[in-house]
Amino acid sequence: SRNGRDYITMGLTGGLAPESPGLGNMDHLALVTMTETGPVIGNVLMNGITDKRGAVPVMEDFLLYRPRQITQTGHSLGIRSVPNLRDLGGYKTSDGRIIRNGLLYRSNQLSEISEADMQVMSSLRLKNAYDLRTLAEREARPEELPETAQYVVLDVLADAEQANPAMLEKLMQNPEEANATLGDGKAEAGFIESYRQFVSLPSAQREFRNFFLGISNPEELPALFHCTTGKDRTGWAAAAFLTLMDVPREKVYEDYLKSNDYILPAYKKVIDGFVAAGGEENIVTAILGVRKEYLDAAFDEMESRYGTIENYFAQALDIDAKEQQQLKEIYLY
């Protein structure tokens, strides 16, 4: 540090070095300057060559040296066009270990990412992006990905008789019909049933198995997974992952409910327009937000069928104890 605000950081690509969680694959050095809005990369040194790219925002957990202890727990990356993009690292387990930052990200869809935000996204050096959406959702809003990321489709709701996301989007265009169809608690009841299906549907079990096996390969990290708004299918995947890592249940819910902090403000115009056209606010927030009762339903389904998260992984997802332990060794330190 020259002035208490500038720091040298290494390997902004993530990695598995146990002594430096979140650092690894160290192929460059960067001068990071602390600004009022957070740390930014200034001149980047690539193999001894100064690359004057200008300021690029980065997360403080990438800094090799920090002037104070910073706890990055399920933090947002602050990418405005992808508001629910968050790092799943930083959570502490019941036995005191911590999930590594920079390896696994949860997100909403990437179809509307801006060019400037794509540059920031590219700095994550993603290897895989897992899309949990239905075919109709993917066709309506095709994926936009960084060049480094391989696109993997995992249609969790393929076996659902009627995939709720497509139906709900149509109803949102007609507030009067939405009131009749989804009022009096019907919207919440529909989501509760969907969350049970995340556990019980054959397609959900198949695709969540593929997801967890995919993120258990260190060579395929960092990785990102998402659905449409990054709260329901993504929410259960994140909750199951954190629970398997032995993160306390209250912290699992804390991470899950954070979607309300990012998605509802991002959809404020949609919500206001729906209500102005005669729609019930409780309906639209039930659709676009998350409720504790939704995740309760998924956990209830999991526990009533399998008893424990370990049994859910072993019996529903066919991921045995050895493979579960491998996941923990990758993500925990």
Name each region found by the language model.
Residues 18, 51-52, 138-141, 235:
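Extracytoplasmic/secreted cell-surface and envelope-processing proteins
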Residues 229, 233-234:
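Ser/Thr-glycine-rich phosphate-binding loops at phosphate-binding pockets of nucleotides
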Residues 2-66:
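Binuclear metal-dependent phosphoesterase catalytic core
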Residues 1, 226:
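Histidine-centered active-site/metal-ligand motif
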Residues 60-224, 237-333:
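Cys-dependent protein tyrosine phosphatase-like superfamily
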